[in-house]
Amino acid sequence: MKTVSKWFGYIDKPERVPEFMRRAFTMLRSGRPGPVILAVPDPTGTYDETADPYVTVKGWKAAPDPTDVIAAADLLLKAQNPLIYVGEGVIYANASEELKSLAELVNAPVISTLKAKGAFPENHPLFVGVRGDHVSNYLDKSDLVLAVGSSLSPGRFSHGIPNAATKTIIHCNVDELHV
């Protein structure tokens, strides 16, 4: 179950139901979206659900270190040919307007994953596309790649970054497992 879910829990004792429910809802409402699974064994005991009433769980939002943001902004502004690579995390974060403002501010072309289509207006002059030779050409010419909301993993990122060792790559993602 762990391979198909964000989190998996097994309730081994009835008195642990509230603990597992809180953890499951915390995982649902925090970070990268994904399914959670709670396994409940055969009902061998009883549990009084009024003994520990459910309290709504507030999700958390990750935030980068402000000094890292300043350093990344400085690198982005100094780049000669920056490129923004967008993943589905931009959609999950409802950050499309902020992405558009950033791209326009630094005049950086934008490419996206298939799952991020729509995160940046496809009729915008800075939008390059998802795949194809033109995307490869922009990647090749870039001196800085700002990857936002994308894991850059080979299964999701259809283009390798040519000459990656000679480029500055800034990777911004809420899921630390994808950095």
Which role does the model predict for each range below?
Residues 47-53, 94-98, 121-126, 156-160:
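Short acidic, glycine/serine/threonine-rich loops at helix termini
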Residues 37-39, 107-114, 170-173:
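Short internal beta-strands
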